[in-house]
Amino acid sequence: MAQHVNLQLGDKVADFACGTGGFLKSAYDVLAKQTNDGKVSDLQVLNSSFYGVEKKPLPYLLSVTNLLLHRIEQPHIVNGNSLSKNVDDYTDKDKFSVILMNPPYGGSELDIIQKNFPSNLRSAETADLFMTLIMYRLAYNGRAAVVIPDGLLFGGGNKRAIKERLLQRFNLHTILRLPTSVFAPYTSIATNVLFFDRLSKEEEQANKGWSTKQTWFYRMDMPQGYKNFSKTKPLLLEHMKDLEAWWNNREEIIVDGFPKAKAFTPDELKQLDFNFAQCGFPTVEEEILPPDELIAQYQAKRQEQEAIVDKALANILALINAKE
């Protein structure tokens, strides 16, 4: 994700649910390569580039430790709830040029937290609120990459309002559909990555329609030979080669009659009632045979297996008799 948000030295990078600081560390790895041979001013800029918030005490401590170990001498990590402030109270100084996040999903928030958001964007679901928070805290010309669950893609109600606002106010240029097991063994929830940018102040003020011109959807299929990812068989960089090749040379891809990559305009997505669950994973339908065909198949298979067993027994008996 950090490689696809055009990180530049001087960017202010934020993660409002930073966990152990993995995304901030990834951003550091990208920006550290842009420093000039240990130039003091570059290192000072680099050290002041990262901001994180973590609600839980243990991950908070681990995130601070993680950044310290990677030579970020003054980690700007806060132990708290990013959702506890009214989004209308944020000013330009509270906004960031890059936001990288994998917000918690499956959780729910109290009414007092939900009231910090506009009524049409309110939700008890934590991931929805973080998605709205990101839209309020991304600076002009800012870039964001956010992991979100499938529920937001096809959901209606407040989820629909969030998606419509995203297309109206931001350039939602890419949605990456991830395999279900990509975060195994930590979660089996199907996830996606949304990549979007905010326009410049001048462009935003002049814009009268959709800020998004088109949104590309790309389905990342399982590598050949893999049924799923796991702790012992994790997602590796080499598995991303097809995605990397496509990213800079985008074109529609059809596999076995199903779209793997395809672009949609905001008007087309509106006609689909803002259903972002496009270029999904094909489902293999199992053919259910009539009972007589199933019985016939079973009997044929049974006879085949019995013949194999009979042949093996005959060979064993022949060996025994030969020794006698």
Where do the PLM segments sit?
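A conserved structural/catalytic subdomain of Rossmann-like adenosyl-cofactor enzymes
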Residues: 79, 85, 91-324
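Conserved S-adenosyl-L-methionine
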Residues: 2-101, 106-108, 124, 128, ...
